[in-house]
UniProtKB/Swiss-Prot annotation:
This is Activin receptor type-1. ATP binds at V214, G215, K216, G217, R218, Y219, G220, E221, V222, K235. The chain crosses the membrane at residues 124-146. It is an enzyme of class 2 (transferase). Residues 147-509 are cytoplasmic. It is a single-pass type I membrane protein.
Length: 509
């Protein structure tokens, strides 16, 4: 085996080409440069900092799109910068402060090729052939070595080992043949975000067929779409809500948000239809619709009521907590939690949607990222400190406590629809009896801050142990003093305890 390894090493060295000094990779310069930043990905920033600056030009639907920016890590832009210009895209890279200010990428003139492009393709071809040759040699030698090793150790195997001692092969499929579940499972190990890689996102987005509009609002429309026979939800943002689209895209692509009680993100894309730009956010499709719609049509038993509220609490706890490590996430506060932003799944659980107003916080850097969205939350669900403008806007915990207030109101909405002793209330939104259908900021401030009113708890709740516990829990979410409110994790544990006691009661019966 030692001789075989030595032979393999020699053959690998012979197979791989030895690049000349001028072809060697430049050493990565750890220095960061200030670069001009222009384009959608920059948000409101006009500069960025990275190890390489770039200027790019691409042709999209006949329009030329110019962008400038930076690669924060040198390796990130290595292949992009080496790729020769094509008729549809060109990238120019440089190193130095503001070096891309006066650099403009140019598309190749028809019939001309850029210097070095032929050499580049020749080098790439040689490298590919060499690697293929080396891999074939390696496979042959490994096969011979394994056969010898297996023959030499065959007598040590017991009958069961002989029967099941096979080597698993790797099965590959074309990207176009993959299901969304397979693509998303693979993406968990290929990046820090919770969606697909950017190139796959664009591919998926452009293969979607819109089937029917399932919802409209101030933000835009939600459509049921189809991708290779699978249903997806396509949220099409209006141009005035561009910042919400950008914020959700940013969150999903930078934070590992995958959780059964957070709406599953698939892709995000900017596309052109009917001579206008559309902003798409593509997510999992839940045919049951929003919790708001579901509660108007459906009454709940104790089990389904607890399943709904516990799943919402689990999703909120996952958002609020910071997870450390390579597969970790920043702490996030939702800021617009309400029954219309919660979707009902087929299994009776719920998932939290619409992160357009979310706030992020990282303990390691102590940075609070509130985004750049002028949109405000829903007035009916606003906490007292938001209405009277006493909220500490530079403190992340303040935003989490605002979410807890809103969760208490959602809990009240759900509990009203739970049947006990044959009695159930009609669905009503919070404060339906004291403010108009579309309350103003001042309407809510008077009711919540001045009069300190809270949603009414029906007397019949106190004859049911589950509703009694839920009533106590929601009151602890509605304290006027934000710091006295429960945390999402405490709520989740309390609801789990209530759920477990119900299971125990059933077992005893």
């Amino acid at each position: 085996m030692v001789d075989g390894a030595m032979i393999l090493s020699v053959l690998m060295m012979m197979a791989l080409p030895s690049p000349s000094m001028e072809d060697e990779e430049p050493k990565v310069n750890p220095k960061l440069y200030m670069c001009v930043c222009e384009g959608l990905s920059c948000g409101n920033e006009d500069h960025c900092e990275g190890q390489q600056c770039f200027s790019s030009l691409s042709v999209n639907d006949g329009f030329r799109v110019y962008q400038k920016g930076c690669f924060q890590v040198y390796e990130q832009g290595k292949m992009t910068c080496k790729t020769p210009p094509s008729p549809g895209q060109a990238v120019e890279c440089c190193q130095g402060d503001w070096c891309n200010r006066n650099v403009t990428a140019r598309l190749p003139t028809k019939g001309k090729s850029f210097p070095g492009s032929q050499n580049f393709h020749l080098e790439v071809g040689l490298i590919i052939l060499s690697v293929v040759f080396a891999v074939c040699l390696f496979a042959c030698i490994l096969g011979v070595a394994l056969r010898k090793f297996k023959r030499r150790n065959q007598e040590r195997l017991n009958p069961r080992d002989v029967e099941y001692g096979t080597i698993e092969g790797l099965i590959t499929t074309n990207v176009g043949d993959s299901t969304l579940a397979e693509l998303l499972d693979h993406s968990c190990t290929s990046g820090s975000g919770s969606g697909l890689p950017f190139l796959v996102q664009r591919t998926v987005a452009r293969q979607i067929t819109l089937l029917e509009c399932v919802g409209k609002g101030r933000y835009g429309e939600v459509w049921r779409g189809s991708w290779q026979g699978e249903n997806v939800a396509v949220k099409i943002f209006s141009s005035r809500d561009e910042k919400s689209w950008f914020r959700e895209t940013e969150l999903y692509n930078t934070v590992m948000l995958r959780h059964e009680n957070i709406l599953g993100f698939i892709a995000s894309d900017m596309t052109s239809r009917h001579s206008s730009t559309q902003l798409w956010l593509i997510t999992h499709y839940h045919e049951m619709g929003s919790l708001y719609d579901y509660l108007q049509l459906t009454t709940l038993d104790t089990v389904s009521c607890l399943r709904i509220v516990l799943s919402i609490a689990s999703g909120l706890a996952h958002l609020h907590i910071e997870i450390f490590g390579t597969q970790g996430k920043s702490a996030i506060a939702h800021r617009d939690l309400k029954s219309k932003n919660i979707l009902v799944k087929k299994n009776g659980q719920c998932c939290i949607a619409d992160l357009g107003l979310a706030v992020m916080h990282s303990q390691s850097t102590n940075q609070l990222d509130v985004g750049n969205n002028p949109r405000v939350g829903t007035k009916r669900y606003m906490a007292p400190e938001v209405l009277d403008e006493t909220i500490q806007v530079d403190c992340f915990d303040s935003y989490k406590r605002v979410d807890i207030w809103a969760f208490g109101l959602v809990l009240w909405e759900v509990a009203r629809r739970m049947v006990s002793n044959g009695i159930v209330e009609d669905y009503k939104p919070p404060f339906y009896d004291v403010v108009p259908n579309d309350p103003s900021f001042e309407d809510m401030r008077k009711v919540v801050c001045v009069d300190q009113q809270r949603p009414n708890i029906p007397n019949r709740w106190f004859s049911d142990p589950t509703l009694t516990s839920l009533a106590k829990l929601m009151k602890e979410c509605w304290y006027q003093n934000p710091s006295a409110r429960l945390t999402a994790l405490r709520i989740k544990k309390t609801l789990t305890k209530i759920d477990n006691s119900l299971d125990k009661l059933k077992t005893d019966c």
